Amino acid sequence: MMSEDGYNTDFPRNPLYIFFSDFRSVLKFDELGLEIARIALPAALALTADPIASLVDTAFIGQIGPVELAAVGVSIALFNQVSRIAIFPLVSITTSFVAEEDACSSQQDTVRDHKECIEIGINNPTEETIELIPEKHKDSLSDEFKTSSSIFSISKPPAKKRNIPSASSALIIGGVLGLFQAVFLISAAKPLLSFMGVKHDSPMMRPSQRYLSLRSLGAPAVLLSLAAQGVFRGFKDTTTPLFATVIGDVTNIILDPIFIFVFRLGVTGAATAHVISQYLMCGILLWKLMGQVDIFNMSTKHLQFCRFMKNGFLLLMRVIAVTFCVTLSASLAAREGSTSMAAFQVCLQVWLATSLLADGYAVAGQAILASAFAKKDYKRAAATASRVLQLGLVLGFVLAVILGAGLHFGARVFTKDDKVLHLISIGLPFVAGTQPINALAFVFDGVNFGASDFGYAAASLVMVAIVSILCLLFLSSTHGFIGLWFGLTIYMSLRAAVGFWRIGTGTGPWSFLRS
């Protein structure tokens, strides 16, 4: 039986039922559907804004020259790779911890307000005013007296700032990690670039080192911004991060041509524009956050550094496992030759870009689930997991149809080479056909994080990576290009399977499904 809130009030004993519960209501805009949409849509838009801005950024840099474009490309790849190690654990953990603390704090405030109202004789704690004039005399009062009597109404006290220790912890950790990353990349820029294949006598070395060193100055702003985004996600507010992201990206796009062409700063101007935009974005997010959270009035005993570091290490292992699988597949494609690498890169970028849309549902699921688990509202937890997984599956099928048709006719946008186009057509069935599996795998990530099941999420992904690496090595050696895509299909299928197994067996935080 469905409640008006959008979740099933009957609690089945078979955990597998959660995947099929109320599937007919998957697109219904009830209370739960609207809450998911309010979180998922801005989150997906914010996630897609940065890649679009990067494309525009790349277009401006490409006007300087091919050497500068290649140099900046290597520097950006290195910067993003180092950043990813810290970003993913920081944002994921912050979202869950803040959502849990905010839910518990709201419950405590409700109970405290209820007790205070009972003590002063108010039966309904939600009333904003106390009636001072008997009902039977209201009709005889003049309008003037009614107006003047309103001064006796009890007004609401000003809203207090939230006291969320995890928010302060995340910002401190983000700031420290950002400073460490900046020092590391600036001091080790030359050897790191050499490791990436840029030789010391290459014409790319000087512009790539200059760009990386300047870009690294923005690392503290990047990590602080993402920590703040994690806090807002925990509050189920993805609109504020979207606003800050758009402002920052637009600023970057405006400053790029000014610094690059008007001031003739070249690569230096591109890096400077990016750093300015990052600090602007960081400033907006911190300003908005300080209006809602008391981030400074926090004793050290309430900060949760140990909890952050423990779960952060688990997710770090997970990030390394995921990154290694994708990097290995690209490396194996490169060994097949430039034609295979070009086709693989086009297919891979399209394959990964579509995941950003599914990540919107993952963010929504994580925030709502973390709040529900903190309140021990297991019916809402089950309903939320069911709904976001079903929405992810529907999205996957829609993307499969769009990519199946779009990439078939639009592949020439990426290349004119007939050999590359032929290989893209071979990879197309995998890119399009795996979209439902990919979407489920990414949404399962959000579901696991929302349940604070970080240990299982890390351990299962490491096991998946080991099996997938063996499959990639074997299949690429026996079947070449198509073998790589068979291997990646196995990898994503296993990622979805371990998520399905955890909930379907009713183990870990999902044991309530069996009770």
Swiss-Prot record:
Compartments, as annotated in UniProt: Cell membrane
CDD domains: MATE_DinF_like
Top-rank taxon: Eukaryota
Bilayer topology: Multi-pass membrane protein
GO CC terms of this entry: plasma membrane; root hair
Major localisation: membrane
GO BP terms, alphabetized: citrate transport; monoatomic ion transmembrane transport; response to aluminum ion
Tissues with expression: Expressed in roots, but not in shoots. Detected in the mature regions of the root, extending from above the root-hair region to the root-shoot junction.
Induction: Up-regulated by aluminum. The STOP1 transcription factor is required for MATE expression.
Transmembrane segments: 36-56, 59-79, 169-189, 212-232, 243-263, 267-287, 313-333, 350-370, 391-411, 424-444, 454-474, 481-501
Disruption phenotype: No visible phenotype when grown under normal conditions. Strong reduction of aluminum-activated citrate release and small decrease in aluminum tolerance.
MF-aspect GO terms: antiporter activity; citrate transmembrane transporter activity; xenobiotic transmembrane transporter activity
Topological domains, Extracellular: 57-58, 190-211, 264-266, 334-349, 412-423, 475-480
Record topological domains on the Cytoplasmic side: 1-35, 80-168, 233-242, 288-312, 371-390, 445-453, 502-515
Keyword Zinc-finger found: no
Record keywords, A-Z: Cell membrane, Ion channel, Ion transport, Membrane, Transmembrane, Transmembrane helix, Transport
Note: Acts in parallel but independently of ALMT1, an aluminum-activated root malate transporter.
Family note: Belongs to the multi antimicrobial extrusion (MATE) (TC 2.A.66.1) family.
Function: Citrate transporter critical for aluminum tolerance. Responsible for citrate exudation into the rhizosphere to protect roots from aluminum toxicity.
The protein's name: Protein DETOXIFICATION 42
